[in-house]
Each structure stands twice: as structure tokens, then as C-alpha cells.
């Protein structure tokens, strides 16, 4: 059979002989490709949760559907908690399910391609790769996401509850202008901190924490590599 290459790896050479370095390189490439193939549902998740929280309470007041919720035997607290749970648990669970489905669909598609070229998908893909470990990693990220996204979800729902109009602008402008004020007057110097600390830990955390993976920069990557 003719040689086929995927991501720069020669399938013919790998089939005939693989040393430990080749096997490690192949496994890394497969795992990375799987994670990339399942990335788009996680990106969509960030935008969906952002705008869902932003309109969760504002839209009800606008179209008076809040009257429907008040007619149910639920307190306002229960209503808010249910919406927060939808954003923090239900939405990421659905996104992770879609991401896992995309990863396995990608593996099946590449397996069919390998079979068509007389390759062995078990030894070239499923063996070196870690599809179950990657799926477990995504599932384990759900509680991490729920905790990490909580500041943004809380801030957006707060803006949604009290803003009379344009909750998006209020949600963006307040932390951004606060950051500009802090930077302009160097307020953080009082605490022996740079203005960048406020932008990273207050502004960014209040607006961007609903996007999966934004917690990576605060982790010790070497510890999990």
C-alpha cells in the first residue's frame, strides 16, 4: 500500500516500525487533534452562557414573562438559582457531551480513512491515543467550569436584574471604566500591586470566566503535563 501521512506522520513507517519517541509523538498528535475537534462546542458554550445570563432576568421583565414565574410556587431565590444552575451545570454538560461526540466522530472518520489505505486504526489511532482519558478530562472540567464561571454568571445576572435598558452595555462599561479609573489614578499602588492585577483578576474575571479554558493561565501547566 502507498504511504499516507496525517499531521506529518507517515502511516506506512509507523505501521512497520515505531520506536518510543514515534509512539509518544503519535499519541500527542492524536490527543491534540481530538481536543481540537471537540473545541467548537466549548467556544459556543461561552457565548451562549454569556448572553443567556445577560438576558435571563432582563428579558422576563421586558416581556412580562416574570408574571408567569411569580404564578408558580417558586420563590424569586429559587428562580434565580434555577437559572444559575442552567448556566453553570446544564449548559456545560450539554457542551461537553457535544464535544465528546465530536471527538469520537473525528476518530471514526480518521479510522475509516486509515482502513481505506490498508492501515490498522487500532494500532495507529485508538492504541496510541487516549480517547477515554480525553473524554474523562472534559467531564472532570464541568465542576471546574461551574466554580470558575461563577463570578461572571453572578455579575451578568446582577446586571440583568437591575438594568432598565441595555444590560450588555452596563455589564461591559462598569468593569471596563473601573479598570480605566484604577489605571489612570494608579490606585493599585496603594496595595503594592500593578493595574494589570485589577484588569486580570477583576475585569477579565467578571466578563470572560464563562469561556472554558480561561483558568489555564492560573494553573501550573508543568504539573499537569
What kind of feature is each model-predicted range?
Residues 56-63, 106, 110-118, 165, ...:
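Perimembrane helix-loop junctions in membrane proteins
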Residues 2-29, 194-225:
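Low-complexity, proline/glycine-enriched hydrophobic segments characteristic of transmembrane helices
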Residues 132-136, 165-213:
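Transmembrane helix segments
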Residues 16-47, 82-161, 220:
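Secretory targeting signals
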Residues 71-76:
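Short helix-to-coil transition segments within interhelical loops
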